[in-house]
């Protein structure tokens, strides 16, 4: 039986990591493979260094994309072929949404171009949970975690959120948009319902 790929997306501070920890500790997902992007590989390390620096935006995209390709070939594809459930905290949609903003001064339709260079080799998720929140609230949350990255700025996150919602509108069969500015128990309930429905389908 072929496995499933479930991805968690959203702007920084939207609550993805909190939900990932919840799922990781839930008995229903004891046999699931939990992963994230950027990865912990040497390519992922290069991505983290780029995030903390003033690396050229196009070079940064290529690092993210290389990490994604390696992630698919070394972990995601083998796990899916073994029939496992894979849950990834960030995936290709993060690139479409974020670099679609950072590259808007470099090209006319950056998000479409980034999607094009992924076409034919990336694995499309069976389900993408998009955690949606007002960027101002998200930045406040990020500030409470300590030092902020260059991506954790309100103006940038407004554009990223718009890109995410455009992606969700184009693929309603794949995306489930979840409002995360509410009680955590309600969010967890909606997440479990969405994942259970896709696993049982």
Swiss-Prot record:
- What Gene3D superfamilies does the record point to? P-loop containing nucleotide triphosphate hydrolases
The top EC class, named as a word, is transferase
Its BP terms in the Gene Ontology are: dTDP biosynthetic process; dTTP biosynthetic process; dUDP biosynthetic process
- Protein residues bound to ATP: 10-17
Alphabetical UniProt keywords:
ATP-binding, Kinase, Nucleotide biosynthesis, Nucleotide-binding, Transferase
Q: Which GO terms describe its molecular function?
A: ATP binding; dTMP kinase activity
EC number(s) recorded for this UniProt protein: 2.7.4.9
Matches recorded under InterPro entries: P-loop_NTPase, Thymidylate_kin-like_dom, Thymidylate_kinase
Q: Which GO terms describe its cellular component?
A: cytoplasm
Reactions mediated catalytically:
dTMP + ATP = dTDP + ADP
Top-level lineage group: Archaea
NCBIfam families referenced in this protein's UniProt entry, alphabetically: DTMP_kinase
What family is reported? Belongs to the thymidylate kinase family.
Q: Which HAMAP family match?
A: Thymidylate_kinase
**Name this protein carries in UniProt:** Probable thymidylate kinase
- Natural source organism: Methanococcoides burtonii (strain DSM 6242 / NBRC 107633 / OCM 468 / ACE-M)
* Encoding gene (name): tmk
């Amino acid at each position: 039986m072929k496995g499933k790929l479930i991805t968690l997306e959203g702007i920084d501070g939207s609550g993805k990591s909190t939900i990932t920890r919840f799922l990781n500790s839930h008995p229903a997902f004891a046999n699931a493979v939990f992963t994230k992007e950027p990865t912990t590989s040497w390519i992922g390390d290069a991505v983290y260094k780029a995030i903390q620096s003033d690396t050229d935006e196009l070079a940064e995209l290529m690092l993210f994309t290389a990490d994604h390709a390696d992630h698919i070939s070394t972990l995601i594809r083998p796990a899916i072929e073994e029939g496992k459930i894979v849950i990834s905290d960030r995936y290709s949609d993060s690139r479409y949404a974020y670099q679609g903003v950072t590259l808007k001064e470099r090209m006319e339709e950056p998000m479409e171009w980034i999607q094009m260079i992924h076409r034919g080799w990336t694995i499309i998720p069976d389900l993408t949970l998009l955690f949606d929140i007002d960027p101002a609230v998200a930045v406040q949350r990020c500030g409470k975690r300590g030092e902020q990255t260059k991506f954790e700025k309100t103006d940038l996150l407004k554009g990223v959120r718009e890109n995410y919602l455009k992606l969700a509108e184009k693929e309603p069969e794949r995306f489930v948009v979840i409002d995360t500015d509410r009680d955590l128990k309600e969010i967890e309930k909606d997440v479990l319902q969405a994942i259970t429905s896709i696993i049982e389908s």
